[in-house]
């Protein structure tokens, strides 16, 4: 009963804050002006405020689910898209898109970001599987080092080809540039999260170890890399639109596990 009440309170709080956020910005918008049909404020509401809210919700949900998947599959509570080099790999993909396809659309940048994020996450997990000593701190430490190497490569390429300013928008997450027509790729989070829920039981089994999974007839490597691909695509779609949003995938799953 207590858990149900806390869930209701949190849901109502989210709804209330979401509604309030729609009327916060440089230009004042009031519910009365929307109801009375103020065209200018209605246009701002539909082009900027509503897309911003939807992007924020998709980002929070997506990064949390991606972090939970990675923690479950890696059997480590400190692994996330941030400490697993997924975000760094996605940023590298965006830079490559800017270098090789300067006129690329949002979809083109997202495609590059998907590929590099998936490959970077796969390499990270493959590498930690080869590490003999898998202490709780060792795995995320390896991920942070690997991510810093990728970030170093990204920074070097950006500096060499004078793309530092162009890349800066994706180095720090922000929602100020979220507008209608420039954020819709983040909607990929919704089907990917739904797909993650479908595979949730398989992820739990794989998280118990390779031998346990094989005894239950679950294809360990297939489920492992399917989960990592889902987490990487969620992260890449968010990074492409709003930039690097760090540590949500690390903090939120651990907070939920503390109270559930």
Which stretches of residues belong to each language-model region?
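Alpha-helical transmembrane segments in inner-membrane proteins
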Residues: 1-260
């Amino acid at each position: 009963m207590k858990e149900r009440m806390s869930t209701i309170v949190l849901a109502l709080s989210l709804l209330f804050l979401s509604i309030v956020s729609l009327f916060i910005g440089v230009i004042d918008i009031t519910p009365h002006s929307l109801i009375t049909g103020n065209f200018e404020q209605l246009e701002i509401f539909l082009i900027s405020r509503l897309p911003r809210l939807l992007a924020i919700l998709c980002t929070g949900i997506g990064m949390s689910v991606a972090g939970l998947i990675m923690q479950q599959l890696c059997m480590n509570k400190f692994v996330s898209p941030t400490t697993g080099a997924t975000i760094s790999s996605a940023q590298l993909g965006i830079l490559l898109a800017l270098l090789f396809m300067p006129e690329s659309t949002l979809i083109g940048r997202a495609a590059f970001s998907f590929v590099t994020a998936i490959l970077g996450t796969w390499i990270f997990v493959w590498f930690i599987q080869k590490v003999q000593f898998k202490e709780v701190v060792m795995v995320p430490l390896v991920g942070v080092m690997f991510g810093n190497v990728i970030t170093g490569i990204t920074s070097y390429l950006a500096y060499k080809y004078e793309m530092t300013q162009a890349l800066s928008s994706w180095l720090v997450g922000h929602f100020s540039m979220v507008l209608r027509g420039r954020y819709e790729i983040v909607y990929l989070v919704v089907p990917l999260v739904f797909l993650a829920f479908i595979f949730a039981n398989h992820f739990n089994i794989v998280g118990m170890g390779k031998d346990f999974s094989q005894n239950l007839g679950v294809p360990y490597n297939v489920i492992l890399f399917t989960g990592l691909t889902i987490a990487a695509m969620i992260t890449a779609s968010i990074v492409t639109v709003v930039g690097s949003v760090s540590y949500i995938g690390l903090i939120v799953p651990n907070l939920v596990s503390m109270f559930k």
